[in-house]
Amino acid sequence: DSSESNEIDDVLFLGRRDANSFMKYPQLGN
């Protein structure tokens, strides 16, 4: 199920991006 694996990778990538944005701009977390 390569397609399913890719979807999971996308979710993890977006999660890391959001985490990085939160670290850079914590005020956006409010």
Swiss-Prot record:
Phosphoserine found at: 2-3, 5
Record PTM text: Requires vitamin K-dependent gamma-carboxylation for its function.
Principal location class: secreted
GO cellular component, one term: extracellular matrix
Keyword Aminoacyl-tRNA synthetase: no
Compartments where found: Secreted
GO BP field: cartilage development; cell differentiation
Entry superkingdom: Eukaryota
The entry's keywords: Chondrogenesis, Developmental protein, Differentiation, Gamma-carboxyglutamic acid, Phosphoprotein, Secreted
Phosphoprotein as UniProt keyword: yes
Family named by the database record: Belongs to the osteocalcin/matrix Gla protein family.
Role: Associates with the organic matrix of calcified cartilage.
Protein name in the entry: Matrix Gla protein
